[in-house]
């Protein structure tokens, strides 16, 4: 597998970033996620998980803004992780018109609800804040195509899996993708709750 079958805006971004060849992990994972199946992806740091998440999200959304409701929801540990992922996304979306927004505890919930209402394609946020926004009717998930968890190791020692499950069980047809350095007890719990058919890819 190469990057040849990706959308032109993604290939242009990869070229500008001087990324020519996928990692062995990306060769396995990118086509698997593109196929639409639920995936739990386990690999060490440096395998290319974040880039894979970004590429597949843009690919799934066809690289274009569409209507007002979010089509991808990405769960992260905290504000710092959200902003870092947004920065990486910006490197890959510069040839698209996709709209990205971050939601976390250190900002007013009304501002976040208002911004989401005006129209975004990708929302990056913490489970706690997104759960609160959702149950205040501040985000419409009827058009959601992907629910992703970046670096799911952060779930250990928290109750976030409960908040994630609340969102997941409210969705209709949606692809779930989880990235992690390790296969943990909380990922196993997510499998029991709503990822029973997910393919586990471990490198």
Q: How would you label these PLM feature ranges?
A:
Residues 1-42:
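Conserved pre-motif I regulatory segment
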Residues 27-39, 49-67, 90:
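Walker A/P-loop NTP-binding motif
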Residues 32, 63-68, 93-95, 114-118, ...:
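Conserved catalytic network of the ASCE P-loop NTPase/AAA+ motor domain
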Residues 39, 72, 100, 146, ...:
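Hydrophobic/aliphatic anchor position in the core parallel beta-sheet
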Residues 43-47:
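The conserved Walker
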Residues 67-129, 144:
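Conserved nucleic-acid-binding Ia/Ib motif block in the N-terminal RecA-like helicase ATPase lobe
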Residues 126-140:
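Conserved RecA-like ASCE ATPase "motif II neighborhood" in helicase/translocase motors
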Residues 141-203:
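Post-DEXD/H (motif II) to motif III coupling segment of the RecA-like Helicase ATP-binding lobe
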